[in-house]
Amino acid sequence: MSLNTLENVLLVDDDIDHLSICSLILQRRNYAVRILSGCKNMDELIGVVREFRPGIIFMDHDMPGVSGMDATRELKSNPLSKSIPVIYFSGQDNVAELASAAGADDFLRKHFYMPKLLELTARYTA
């Protein structure tokens, strides 16, 4: 049995507006949401994962400090977090390739249709 709480959603992004919108949508569907505004270092990210125990993580590609690619690779190589689905998001046209290179489970293009956020969350936390 996983120690992660399926209803917990971790959003990692440096765009506060994007975080706020995603958080609001997910909270209205009764998901518990934790926001990590950017990723200063891997210890911070792993600490949040250890404490919050997300059932899914949405990871931005472009962030100051630790890149989304490095953070996703670390999550997927760490025994604590390797089974947690990571959904990669970016405004770049090649988001699918970026997600694959990072080892993410799926991807979501920024400026997405909001039901797609809910669809992916429900699919990976079911």
Question: Where is each model-derived feature located?
Answer:
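Receiver (REC) domain active-site loop signature in two-component systems and cognate sites
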Residues: 63
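Acidic catalytic/metal-coordinating carboxylates
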Residues: 67-73
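Alpha4 helix (beta4-alpha4-beta5 surface) of REC/receiver domains from two-component response regulators
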Residues: 70, 92-109, 116-119
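Two-component/phosphorelay signaling modules centered on CheY-like receiver
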Residues: 16-36
